[in-house]
Every structure is written in structure tokens, then in C-alpha cells.
Amino acid sequence: MPPKGHKKTADGDFRPVNSAGNTIQAKQKYSIDDLLYPKSTIKNLAKETLPDDAIISKDALTAIQRAATLFVSYMASHGNASAEAGGRKKITPQDVFVALKDVDLAQFVPSVTQSVNEFEQEVAQRKKDKVVRAQDDQDHISSSESETEATEEEGNKRIRTDE
């Protein structure tokens, strides 16, 4: 029995169908347009590196967007090859450094290493701040509870008057 949402075609294969009952053709290849990074992100990154009075044309932004997507995919491919050579499935910063050296971009390794170290320090600081906030919240909650208990005890006391 075919899976739900599939329809038998004339050649005997089962293919998924859309809500209208038409078979959905599987996409064989992806183009770069399917993988592009958001233009807003690319534009913000480009503006950070350019002078304040610089203007980026629409065509230039598209070229930067496509180049960034291709470069990251290329580096990820080389990093993945390095990880697989090391018997791992996950790409580490060291794999990226090896990939940079493999594609003759070794001059960028020191600056990328510095950026990775800064990022790791930021992450560690955020974790510390989160722990401190959680402890402060816990202290605040426990002090609020003790104040509430004290108020309730005072409210339960009855004043005795000798008449």
C-alpha cells in the first residue's frame, strides 16, 4: 500500500501529490538562488566594512550576496572534507583553518582565529551572566517569599486586650 498522499502514476510508480491531486515533481537540482543568504544580512555586513558615506547599488549587493553564498559553501565543503578525514561528522573551527590553508587563504587564519576566540569569550560571558541572573532571580524570589511569610504571620497575630 502506498504512503498517504501518494498517487500511482501510469508507469506504476508512487509519487507524492499536492492538494489538487496532481503529482509533485521532485526537484533534481538546486540553484544558487535557492541557497542565497538574506539581502538584509549581507547589506548590514557590507555596510559595517565600508565607509559611512558609501552607497551599495542593487547589482553590487546581489553580486556580494552570491559571492558570499558560494564562498561559504566552498569553505564548508573543504571543512567537511577535513572533518571526514579526521573521522568526524561535525565541522570544527580547526577544520575551517585547515580549509583556509587548503584553498591558499592561509593569511586569513590569524584574523579568523582571533574572531573565533572573541566569539567564544562572548558566549562564555553570556553563560556567566545567565547564571548570575538566575541566581539573582532565585534570591529575589526567596526573599519575597520570606517577606510574604513575615507579613502573613503579622496579619495572623491578634492583639489581646484585657477588658
Swiss-Prot record:
GO (cellular component) term, any one: CHRAC
Any one biological process term the GO annotation gives: heterochromatin formation
Region (Disordered): 1-22, 126-163
UniProt keywords, alphabetically: DNA replication, Nucleus
Main location (coarse class): nucleus
One Pfam family from the record: CBFD_NFYB_HMF
UniProt cross-references to InterPro entries, sorted A to Z: CBFA_NFYB_domain, DNA_Pol-Epsilon_Subunit, Histone-fold
Record carries keyword Kinase: no
Xref: SUPFAM superfamilies: Histone-fold
Location(s) in or outside the cell: Nucleus
Compositional bias segments (type: Basic and acidic residues): 126-142, 154-163
The organism's place on the tree of life at top rank: Eukaryota
Residue stretches spanning the membrane: none
CDD domains assigned to the protein according to its UniProt record, in alphabetical order: HFD_POLE3_DPB4
One MF annotation (Gene Ontology) recorded for this entry: protein heterodimerization activity
UniProt key word Ribonucleoprotein: no
Function: As accessory component of the DNA polymerase epsilon (DNA polymerase II) participates in chromosomal DNA replication.
Miscellaneous: In eukaryotes there are five DNA polymerases: alpha, beta, gamma, delta, and epsilon which are responsible for different reactions of DNA synthesis.
Quaternary data: Heterotetramer. Consists of four subunits: POL2, DPB2, DPB3 and DPB4.
Protein name per its UniProtKB record: DNA polymerase epsilon subunit D
Species lineage: Eukaryota, Fungi, Dikarya, Ascomycota, Saccharomycotina
